[in-house]
Amino acid sequence: VTGEATALPPILQAEAQSQKYNLQLDFMKHHFSGMLIVRQMPDNEIRILGSTYFGLSLFDFSLHCDTFIVNSCIEPMRKKKMLKILETDFKNLFLKSEKARIKKKSSTFEQRISGKGFGKTVFTLSGFVNGQAEKVQIKHPLIRLRIQLDKLNINNP
């Protein structure tokens, strides 16, 4: 399925109860692995926290309406362009995506494309359970950035 960019529903649904994902982030020569914790706060703010398994905070972001707030972020990622890319990625993940289009879709996976050239992003969704993707891979081909999210279930910590 291809076509013009249309408003697509969020890839992941933020909820009042914390959702946890295994996080693997590769940026240039840096590799980080840990956990992504996402929670919708009572005022509809979405908190996005990335940390290592040992508790070191990688980043702490807030999405409120269409505003992206950097509460904290480690040095290799604290560059203006990098934060802008992460802002776009997290908005595409948790808010309606206005500029994305579905490139491929089947019963087992979906691929969405957002942006062009330097800002091109490929979202690959798979492992659907009740319409929600259990695995999400975000790739930025031109800047060697890859983010892999695997949902952690209560039964499978």
Feature locations, PLM:
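N-terminal leader/targeting segments and the immediate start of mature chains
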Residues: 1-37
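Residues at beta-strand starts and edge strands
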Residues: 17-19, 30-32, 44, 132, ...
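Mature, soluble, non-transmembrane domains
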Residues: 2-3, 22-23, 56, 60, ...
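Solvent-exposed coil/turn segments that connect beta secondary-structure elements
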Residues: 41, 51-53, 64-66, 73
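Membrane-embedded segments
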Residues: 47, 52-58
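Ordered hydrophobic segments in well-structured contexts
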Residues: 35, 47-49, 111
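Beta-strand elements of well-folded, non-transmembrane domains
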Residues: 25-29, 38-42, 52-54, 140-142, ...
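Edge/loop elements at the starts and ends of beta-strands within beta-rich repeat scaffolds
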Residues: 12-16, 39, 44, 61-63, ...
